[in-house]
Regions:
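Beta-rich carbohydrate-recognition modules and glycan-binding surfaces
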Residues: 1-192
Length: 192
């Protein structure tokens, strides 16, 4: 058997979803009112990321996200990207976020800001979204950070799914049903 399959399921697929492996990280940490949930189907085959994106409290800005709980660590060096199996989508724009470190805590208990690697996508229902590592762009507090050190693919510590306003572009209820999140090898990448 191949030590590194073409598709390595991080969540879903042969690795069932576990809602306890995820935690909310919403704009409430900055005084916002957005909320998110990640709930698994009865058979743990599908995870529903849903909530309400409220942009009124932060002047047109806002975000609602679910992130993996610490500690986690994935070595994805032999893979070329990530794939999301989408069961159902509301047609809104989502962001997949990777971190290669665990942010330290500030004295007030909140996490310090660190570089994130982000990929924006608008999924259809019953589709597969694929993103190569080059599709993930470094950001710091939501702004591009072109001088960031390269993403350490052998040291991925956190994965997040985010709904954000893109400064007033979208708001309100959202829902994305996912079959899986998987690391993929070149053989599995779809041609554009």
């Amino acid at each position: 058997m191949d030590e590194h399959p073409n598709k390595f399921y991080l969540f879903g697929g042969y690795t069932l979803w576990n809602e306890h492996a995820w935690s909310p990280s919403d704009d409430r940490v900055r005084g916002g009112k957005s909320r998110s949930l990640l709930v698994c189907s009865a058979d743990s085959a599908v995870a529903t990321f849903s909530g309400d994106l409220d942009i009124t409290a932060l002047g047109g800005a806002g975000f609602a996200s679910q992130r993996t709980v610490d500690p986690q660590s994935w070595d994805l060096l032999v893979y070329q990207g990530l794939s999301l199996g989408v069961a159902k989508s509301d047609g809104k724009k989502y962001t997949l976020v990777l971190k290669d470190d665990t942010p330290p805590k500030r004295p007030d208990g909140r996490e310090e800001s660190t570089v994130s690697w982000e990929y924006d996508f608008v999924p259809g229902s019953e589709t597969e979204v694929t993103a190569s590592w080059a599709d993930f762009k470094p950001t710091y507090r939501g702004k591009p950070k072109p001088d960031a050190a390269p993403l350490r693919l052998d040291h991925i510590k956190r994965i997040s799914i985010m709904m954000r306003s893109f400064f007033g572009e979208q708001q309100g209820p959202f829902r994305l049903d996912l079959n899986y999140i998987a690391a993929i090898r070149a053989e599995s990448m779809s041609e554009d």
